[in-house]
């Protein structure tokens, strides 16, 4: 990525909200009783991303409605997933209100997933001469990585973050370039999305086959050379492999647009953001946001790091340690610091 190009961060809103909801204890509530733990975690990650990368613009993409685009190809797509937790569902309108107060564009389109909006903006931004950062926990997004598109991958909770470049994707998949990640999923499938792949072919075998033959198409062309049960499964499930690759391919033609020249961050009103945070009882974060626009009352988090404070642990029977841990949690909440 180049220092001379403008940098834009595109956040997968659904991915980050889900991870925040499960990483932050469900004990945080707005004054009116509405849950806010996912919002608190989302905003912590948002601020750390801003401090680490100092992007020129920020956009958040959300899913909207059922994933019609992929369900038309694969009716059982994500059908096994349970309904969203009501406490998480209730926080989506609230985070969108906060993002609006922050003057952060929200992009979504009926029937399209946030993944495809990230993919579309990645290519549009690249064509506009920008460096793009895609903030998401979904590994299938690695297929979008180029010299000017990196993925900020939230892997465990919100604290374990990797920056995926073409080289790191190649290392992760043992010689597979980003453009071949859909081929990898064509063979391996993706149980979390109900994408079938080929039975019996896991990640190591999928990587090895693609590295050996060069692509899924070439693996299929040489299917007779694949020995044993794996070869039998491959020859019997060629259609599944091709369909799985198609479903796993991130679209770059979602019906969304962004004026990169007119989009910038930070560009928000201190009063509006303070009021929005106050309405949710997240007042401790106000200084951190105000510092982004030169406001008084607190410096930004140290730039360039996603590290979190050391974990405090206390045994259930150790009253003194438990009291100390509770006091530290209370202090961290008051200071607007990360807790998980």
Per-region residue spans from a language model:
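Charged, flexible boundary elements
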Residues: 107-117, 299-334
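Residue-level marker for well-ordered alpha-helical positions
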Residues: 92-93, 116-119, 203, 271, ...
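Alpha-helical scaffold elements within enzyme catalytic domains, especially in hydrolases
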Residues: 98, 124, 276, 331-332
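Short, hydrophobic beta-strand segments that form beta-sheet elements in well-ordered domains
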Residues: 131-135, 286, 339-340
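Non-catalytic nucleic-acid-binding/docking modules located in mid-to-C-terminal regions
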Residues: 2-5, 54-59, 102-104, 127, ...
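Noncatalytic, basic helical substrate-engagement surface that gates or grips nucleic-acid strands
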Residues: 2-135, 139-165, 240-243, 249-257
């Amino acid at each position: 990525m180049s220092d001379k190009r403008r940098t834009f961060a595109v956040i997968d809103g659904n991915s980050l909200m889900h991870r925040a909801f499960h990483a932050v204890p469900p004990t945080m509530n707005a004054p009116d009783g509405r849950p806010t733990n996912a919002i608190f975690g989302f905003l912590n990650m948002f601020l750390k991303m801003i401090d680490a990368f100092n992007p020129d613009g920020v956009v958040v993409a959300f899913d909207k409605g059922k994933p019609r685009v992929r369900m038309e190809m694969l009716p059982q797509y994500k059908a096994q997933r349970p309904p969203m937790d009501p406490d998480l569902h209730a926080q989506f309108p609230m985070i969108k209100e906060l993002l609006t107060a922050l003057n952060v564009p929200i992009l979504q389109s009926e029937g399209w997933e946030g993944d495809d909006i990230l993919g579309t903006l990645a290519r549009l931004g690249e064509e506009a001469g920008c460096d793009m950062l895609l903030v998401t926990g979904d590994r299938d997004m690695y297929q979008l990585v180029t010299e000017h598109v990196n993925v900020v991958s939230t892997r465990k909770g919100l604290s374990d973050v990797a920056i995926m470049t073409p080289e790191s994707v190649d290392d992760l998949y043992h010689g597979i370039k980003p453009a071949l990640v859909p081929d990898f999923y064509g063979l391996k499938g993706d149980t979390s999305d109900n994408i079938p792949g080929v039975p019996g072919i896991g990640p190591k075998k999928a990587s090895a086959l693609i590295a050996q033959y060069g692509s899924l198409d070439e693996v299929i062309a040489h299917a007779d050379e694949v020995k044993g049960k794996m070869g039998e499964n491959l020859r019997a499930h060629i259609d599944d492999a091709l369909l799985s690759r198609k479903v796993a391919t991130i679209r770059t033609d979602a019906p969304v647009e962004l004026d990169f020249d007119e989009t910038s961050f930070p560009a928000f009103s201190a009063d509006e953001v303070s009021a929005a945070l106050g309405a949710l009882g997240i007042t401790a974060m106000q200084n951190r946001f105000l510092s982004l626009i030169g406001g008084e009352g607190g410096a930004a988090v140290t730039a360039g790091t996603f590290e979190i404070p050391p974990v405090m642990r206390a045994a259930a029977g150790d009253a003194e340690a438990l009291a100390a841990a509770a006091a530290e949690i209370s202090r961290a909440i008051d200071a607007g610091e990360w807790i998980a």
